[in-house]
Regions:
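Functional-site microenvironments in short loops/helix caps that host divalent-cation chemistry
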Residues: 1-156, 162
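Short, structured beta-strand segments at or near domain termini in extracellular proteins/domains
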Residues: 166-177
């Protein structure tokens, strides 16, 4: 209820659930919103990675699985060292051209949408989709300090989680007025 805006979530049965219809208050971004901002906003062509160019990441492109944590994780980015063993302070690495920080690296992000697999949807265009109305797992987008494989570092990578993880965080969004 920040700034007098209505709550976007309420507790029901020990879980936080979205208010319907979604009000104008602060909320988690939908997977579609996150993907648009991460891959397209301010660009003519979609970005593959949160840094400019191809794999591997350029020096200090973000907080990914690297030499600092190679003794703990199975996959790290070869030859990369961002100087952090875990999460880094927000804004430690350069912002994307549109001004957003840490859309790849540092912590993966919890989305508003519940997780679902959509077979046969690759050739269908959907405008501003949202996931199922209910579920057990939420979509997680973005890489984290534990991400070291080429697929995990792509902005198209999606994961899911039922609860907290040490490399999982969130950002807030709200509808433009």
């Amino acid at each position: 209820q920040k700034e007098g805006r209505p709550e976007a979530y309420r507790e029901a049965g020990g879980r936080m659930v979205a208010v319907s219809p979604m009000p104008t208050g602060y909320r988690l971004p939908t997977e579609a919103e996150w993907s648009y901002v991460a891959r397209m906003l301010g660009r003519q062509d979609p970005s593959r990675y949160p840094w400019t160019g191809s794999y591997p990441p350029t020096s200090l492109a973000g907080n990914f699985a690297d030499a600092q944590i190679a003794d703990t994780l199975a996959h790290v980015v070869p030859g990369y060292d961002d100087k952090y063993r875990g999460s880094a302070p927000v804004g430690r690495f350069a912002a994307q051209p549109d001004g957003f920080y840490d859309l790849g690296g540092n912590v993966a992000e919890w989305m508003h949408d519940y997780y679902a697999v959509y077979p046969g949807m690759a050739d269908r265009l959907v405008s501003d989709p949202s996931g199922p109305d209910s579920g057990d797992h939420h979509v997680v987008r973005g890489s984290s300090w534990r991400s070291g494989s080429i697929s995990e570092l792509r902005l198209s990578y999606r994961d899911y989680s039922r609860g907290p993880r040490p490399d999982l965080g969130f950002r807030i969004a709200r509808y433009a007025e």
